[in-house]
């Protein structure tokens, strides 16, 4: 497991001891190696965790983290904007607490100065670790999870990408993501295993343009519509929040094409188990369904329906989508996204509405 994790570390939420072996973690759920972010790019602690220990941590400068109150003497973004030498937060998003690498974050931290990452090097770190893993395991079957951080805030790409997109840091970060994918593909080809490697590229949610930092992403978006023809975006129960890109590549088995088969990322678990001929243990992955043929382009239908529960309940069969009543907000002003919540039942024909 390499890159953005955001699945939690330790069983003490908000009370982790970051200065030793952090458990539970990736090794407790089957990963033999991990090099991951402790949380997300916009949250403290801003450090790499390799095999559940913080990288480059000086034992004489231990890390302390709090999401409740600041540490005396540690400057905050909201109080010291002059220290925000790279990015400033958008108003009212909450990214105005601890300052790391000239960017303020969510949460408070002190210590660990030697272990702190530099945002402009995050993509290089993830890519180098992924390529090295491929090189070291090219002669044996392997599973590699790579979670990129490029589109996630704060967007501060490496200088070699800055200004190349004409769309500011967000556009430059997407070019950086494209480079990462190319480097990983190149490593597979160099190792001679690209033809028989199954690659799944997808996103964990729909797009959000302004998600907490004043990077001019909205201003420089131009006519580009990252949400396509759909309503909503990240945080939304509408299609732009729940329908995400997915590219499956396996040259030895998958023919090029486009499929509208209805699947869920949750189905990858049962489907990959089926591919390996290993039935799931009783009680494992109860929501996961074996739709291997849909992922491989052999079944163009997929699921009969998919359910999402994320504040609101929705059920879709690919043609119709039902959204249950909810008391949640209908619109997120800070991110300019329709959330899809309504006190009334909603039913949409996805091909006509």
What are these language model-derived features?
Residues 178-214:
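Metal-dependent active-site segment of extracytoplasmic phospho-/sulfohydrolases and closely related
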């Amino acid at each position: 497991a390499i890159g953005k994790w955001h699945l939690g570390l330790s069983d003490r939420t908000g009370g982790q001891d970051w200065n030793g072996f952090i458990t539970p973690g990736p090794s407790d759920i089957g990963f033999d190696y991990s090099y991951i972010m402790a949380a997300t790019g916009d949250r403290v602690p801003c450090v790499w965790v390799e095999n559940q220990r913080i990288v480059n941590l000086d034992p004489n400068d231990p890390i302390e983290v709090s999401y409740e109150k600041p540490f005396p003497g540690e400057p905050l973004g909201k109080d010291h904007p002059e220290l925000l030498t790279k990015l400033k937060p958008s108003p009212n998003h909450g990214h105005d607490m601890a300052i790391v690498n000239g960017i303020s974050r969510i949460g408070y931290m002190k210590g660990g100065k030697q272990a702190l990452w530099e945002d402009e090097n995050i993509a290089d770190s993830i890519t180098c670790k992924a390529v090295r893993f491929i090189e070291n395991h090219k002669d044996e079957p392997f599973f590699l999870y790579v979670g990129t951080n490029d589109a996630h805030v704060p967007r501060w790409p490496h200088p070699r990408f800055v200004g190349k997109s004409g769309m500011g840091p967000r556009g430059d970060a997407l070019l950086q993501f494209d480079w990462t994918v190319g480097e990983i593909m190149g490593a597979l080809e160099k190792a001679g295993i690209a033809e028989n490697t199954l690659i799944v590229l997808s996103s964990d949610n729909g797009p959000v343009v302004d998600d907490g930092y004043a990077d001019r992403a909205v201003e420089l978006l131009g006519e580009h519509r990252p949400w396509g023809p759909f309503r909503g975006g990240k945080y939304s129960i509408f299609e732009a929040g729940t329908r995400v890109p997915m590219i499956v590549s396996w040259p030895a088995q998958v023919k090029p094409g486009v499929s509208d088969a209805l699947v869920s990322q949750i189905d990858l678990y049962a489907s990959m188990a089926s591919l390996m001929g290993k039935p799931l243990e009783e009680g494992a992955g109860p929501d996961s369904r074996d739709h291997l043929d849909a992922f491989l382009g052999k079944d163009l239908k997929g699921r009969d329906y998919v359910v999402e529960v994320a504040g609101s309940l929705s059920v879709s069969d690919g043609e119709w989508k039902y959204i249950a009543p909810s008391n949640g907000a209908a619109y997120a002003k800070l991110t300019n996204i329709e959330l899809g919540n309504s006190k009334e039942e909603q039913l949409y024909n996805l091909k006509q509405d």
